[in-house]
Swiss-Prot record:
Keywords: Methylation, Ribonucleoprotein, Ribosomal protein, RNA-binding, rRNA-binding. Belongs to the universal ribosomal protein uL11 family. One of its GO terms (molecular function) is structural constituent of ribosome. GO terms for biological process: translation. This is Large ribosomal subunit protein uL11.
Length: 142
């Protein structure tokens, strides 16, 4: 028989840097989950990813206080900022441009995000990432 699901907890945790401090501790503590067990498992799973990159994670908490979790790919905005070498996007994206990004970089980001995106093909996903880049104040170059 399947376990009864108690809650789903969605967080963004830095890769390889999960610890019991906020936001992880309070979110999991409310559900009665062993926080250190999650931190160790998450850090082990995100070993191969660049440290400090925010990783969205969905934690399924069961009635017996056990848990499973699924990691996603980093947010597109974070990958775009890293590729363009900027700290933050533009406050006025249509007026102030903060950086440039090539179409090849957009395709590479779309490939990275492909597992989590619901696009028809890689071209559609690239266009979606391109829209995110433009709304951040990045200029897309061919």
């Amino acid at each position: 028989m399947a376990k009864k699901v108690q809650a789903y907890v969605k967080l963004q945790v830095a890769a390889g840097m999960a610890n019991p401090s906020p936001p992880v501790g309070p979110a999991l503590g409310q559900q009665g989950v062993n926080i250190m067990e999650f931190c160790k498992a998450f850090n082990a799973k995100t070993d191969s990813i660049e440290k400090g990159l925010p990783i969205p994670v969905v934690i399924t908490v069961y009635a017996d206080r056990s848990f499973t979790f699924v990691t996603k790919t980093p947010p597109a905005a974070v990958l775009l900022k890293k590729a363009a070498g900027i700290k933050s996007g533009s406050g006025k994206p249509n007026k102030d441009k903060v950086g440039k990004i090539s179409r090849a970089q957009l395709q590479q980001i779309a490939q990275t995000k492909a597992a989590d995106m619901t696009g028809a093909d890689i071209e559609a996903m690239t266009r979606s990432i391109e829209g995110t880049a433009r709304s951040m104040g990045l200029v897309v170059e061919d």
